[in-house]
Curated annotation (Swiss-Prot):
The lineage of its organism: Bacteria, Pseudomonadati, Pseudomonadota, Alphaproteobacteria, Hyphomicrobiales. Gene3D superfamilies: Biosynthetic peptidoglycan transglycosylase-like (1.10.3810.10). The keyword DNA-binding does not apply. InterPro entries: Glyco_trans_51, Lysozyme-like_dom_sf, PBP_transglycosylase, Pep_trsgly. Peptidoglycan polymerase that catalyzes glycan chain elongation from lipid-linked precursors. It is a single-pass membrane protein. This is Biosynthetic peptidoglycan transglycosylase. It comes from the Bacteria. The keyword Transferase applies. GO terms for biological process: cell wall organization; peptidoglycan biosynthetic process; regulation of cell shape. It is found in: Cell inner membrane. The chain crosses the membrane at residues 7-27.
Amino acid sequence: MRRLIRVALLTLLLLVAAPYVLTLVYGAGQPVSTLMVWRWLAGATVTRQWVDIERMAPALPRTVVASEDAKFCSHSGIDWDSVRDVLDDLQDGGEASRGGSTITQQVAKNLFLWPGRSVVRKALEFPLAMWIDLVLSKQRILELYLNIAEWGPDGQFGAEAGAAYAFGRSAAQLTPQEAALMASILPNPRVRSAKKPGPGVRRLAATYVARARSAELQQCWRENSGS
């Protein structure tokens, strides 16, 4: 019985430690998300073609940062101000009005954890996001996110597949408006559409185009992309 307990504890320790080791490996290469693997195993269609961030239209990563995580360059994996806002929402009304997850947290979840809301998942996600921010560059974190995010209703993952589905072109050819439309459907590409955007998506896109031009995000981009 004791041996069984030791084996179980060792297995649990290895499962918890594995993402921290894999993060070091994922400084290079073209990793896939747990959701992509799950869809493959379930026999669903998965379309993903990796594209380096340098080969994407610059408007896409800029606009995604503007829409998903405006403090991306200044936080260390967790936006604690946003976390406090979420906690305040829960205390005031019992439901958070905004998600609060940074791009780094979404990378942690997409690469190593599972979808859906869970206290256990969040407890694993927070230290993992801080570790990812510590060992990977901001540019690499963003590159990972842009290549593993779900970007279409039929198994399109990554910016290249998303751009091809929505606009019939590569991620390198996106206009600022098209990039903003793609950013506007995250993280719900099965509910929102960049291909046939409704008024709400169009309004969001216009907002994100303006945000991407802010001085703070322009500086963020220069410091982390070399452009």
